Each structure stands twice: as C-alpha cells, then as structure tokens.
Amino acid sequence: MTKWKRANPNGTRDYLFEECTLIEEVEQKLRLTFLERGYEEIRTPTIEFYDVFAFQNRPIDEEKMYKFFDEKGRIIVLRPDMTIPLARVIGTQRWDTPLKVTYSGNVFRANESHSGKYNEIVQSGIEVIGIDNVRAEIECVISVIQALQKLKVQSFTIEIGQVQLYKCIVKKLSIQDEEERVLRTYIESKNYAALSNFIGEKKLDRCDETVRLLEKLPRLFGNLEVIEEAEKLASSNEMKMAIARVKEMYETIEMLGYGSYISIDLGMIQHLDYYTGVIFKGYIYEIGEEIVSGGRYDELIGNFGEMLPAVGLAVQVNQIVKALQEQQEPYERNQIDIVIHYELNRLAEAERLRNLLRKDGKNAWLSLFSNLSDTFQFARKNKIGTVVEAQNEYLVEYVWNEKWVVQKEGEASCVTFKLR
C-alpha cells in the first residue's frame, strides 16, 4: 500500500523555489497585461461534470480525462480544457456582449507514458465573446504579442491558420470521418509522401483545383505569398472568404508593427474539433513545444445555451517558464542581508527591527534557531555577513571578519539601532 508514496504520478512533477516563483511571476504579468486591455477575470472549478465535455464530436478524447465519482455516483473529471468550462459559464447565463474575459488555472490530461508531455499544466488565456468579425482575432493576437513582449520572451512567432479552409476541402471531396482523421495527421505533420499516397489511394483527380489545394496545404506556410497561392486554387466562395480573413488579419497586424511576430500556416489544423475558423499557434525557436494555441469557436457556446461567436487563446505558462530559464541569466534567490537572532520575549522588537530594515532595502530574516551558535552557523553557510541579536535588554550587531565579532551593542530599541 506504500509502494508509490515517494513518487509522483506519471506526467506530474514538483516545482521548487525559484521555478515556482517564476511561474507566479509569469501568470501575474500575463494577468496584468490582459486586465490593462480590458479583459475581466473568470474562474471555473478544477473539477467539472464529465457531461460538460461529452457533447457532439467529443473534442477531447475520453481516455485523456481523469475521471472519478462524486458522493452521488456522478462522473466528475479534472478539467482537461479551460475553454469548454468557460463556454458553459457563458452559455448558461445571460450576458451583454461583446465580452472580454481572462483566466488562469491548471489543466489535466492523461497523456501516454513516455510522451514527454506533462499531465498537469498551467494555462493563462483570453476569450472575446459575441463578435464574429476579424477584429476579435486581431485583438487576441495583439494582446498575446504584447504580453510576451512584457515577459521579455525572445524569438517567438504566432502562426495563423484557417481550419475552415481545411473543412471546406474535406467536405467538397467527401472525405469521411475515419479517413479525415488520418488525413489530418498527414497534413499536420507535413508528411508529403503519405499525403500523396492518400490522394492516390482515394483515386482523387490531381487535376482538380481542390485536390491540388489539398496536396499543397502542408506547404502553404510563410508570408502573404502563401495566401496568393491558396487564392489561385480556391474553388468556392467559402474557401475564398476563409483565405481572405487570414489575409486581412495578417495585413492589419503587420500594419500595426507586429509583422515580425506573425506568420501564416494554412496546413495547421488544431487537434480540438470545436474550432471553426482562424486558429493560432505560437512557438519559441529554442523549444519545440507550442507556447500559444487557440482560435475561433463559433459553435461551442451553443452546446450550453445561446449560440454566440467567440475566439480565444491560451498561453502555456510552463513552456514560457522553460524558455525564460534558457534565455535569461540563471535565477538568483533573494540574498539575505541580515539575520536577527532573538530571545522569545524580544520577538516583538525583533519583528519591528526586521520591518525597519526592509523599509531601508535590507532583506532581513528572523532566525528560527534557539541557540546563537546555530544562527551563526546558518549565516556562514548562506554567506550572510551580519547577525543582530535581540537580547533581554539590548541589541547586539555581529559581523563576520574571519570570525564573528561585535560591531555595535547597547541600543535597547530598534528605532535607535543603526547598522554600520
């Protein structure tokens, strides 16, 4: 029964000290950036009913959910996604739109063992509800670019795709569900040979414009030249409108001076089926994992109530932290300047002295040791050069000079006690 008591479950880990601090700092900077842009905060429970995620098309595989039962025998899950619970909140209440919301929290997915993915991650994100025009997508992309800039993330790119274009191609070529899932993996992985074999096995006419567009799809990534190629092969108004939306987004964001942070990838297809239009993925060159994901999901909220257009994105906080650790100087824990040793009856005076020193910019630390010799040993181990002792009647300052020597003594009150 105690076999696993010293281990973490697969896909989880402990976060310690400076890494924990960095996670909190990243979350807070993202939060403040989004609040400055007019987003309002929403928090949803860590646990949700399984039914929240079990609607048509099952956007999240059942096998990836952590499931258990509540006191009434109902199936509960640890939330595997942040957007779907938010859609539940929006869909089950009446709101004045447009609505801009932000969130942050942990997400849980049971990934395959040895996949290299963590089963518990931290996400911070934004959603724009009730707007169906391209301004909503532009707002999301600009917001996340500014947030990443404030975090001083280097060498990142936000890729813009269009899942509606892919869906139009699949529909026009009458590709069925099972085949579509296979096709999706070929395009996403840019497996040109497998895609060509798929087209051959399906006996699709390679002279047909839509088939040619399908075969080119994994190669359509880069700048506006990609849009021009796609436009030449678009065989329906719906395809042309989908491509035009990406073009309008790209041109507008470029005009605002953020062109170096964006690129186009029409072969990008999100793994979550609830996306209906423009989609986003963000990457940092130093790490292979995505740091941003999202897109438009105009049909999702309708599963819970009124049908409302929406677009949003999530920032993968853990991946941001990983990148910052690689890009920046090693994190240094706050150096303690002074340790205050005290008798218990002098704790109030020691606390007042600590507060006074902190106001003067000193990092003062109350000793947890009852013996002065132990406090001295702690100070030396942590390269702290000053110890103040609050004795029964007065304060004593010690400094390290090859040994601990008295620098000053005699003051009874911390108000009059001044360090050298």
Curated annotation (Swiss-Prot):
Pathway: Amino-acid biosynthesis; L-histidine biosynthesis; L-histidine from 5-phospho-alpha-D-ribose 1-diphosphate: step 1/9. One of its GO terms (biological process) is L-histidine biosynthetic process. GO terms for cellular component: cytoplasm. Pfam families: tRNA-synt_His. This function is generally fulfilled by the C-terminal part of HisG, which is missing in some bacteria such as this one. PANTHER family: ATP PHOSPHORIBOSYLTRANSFERASE REGULATORY SUBUNIT, HISTIDYL-TRNA SYNTHETASE. Belongs to the class-II aminoacyl-tRNA synthetase family. HisZ subfamily. This is ATP phosphoribosyltransferase regulatory subunit. It comes from Bacillus cereus (strain ATCC 14579 / DSM 31 / CCUG 7414 / JCM 2152 / NBRC 15305 / NCIMB 9373 / NCTC 2599 / NRRL B-3711).
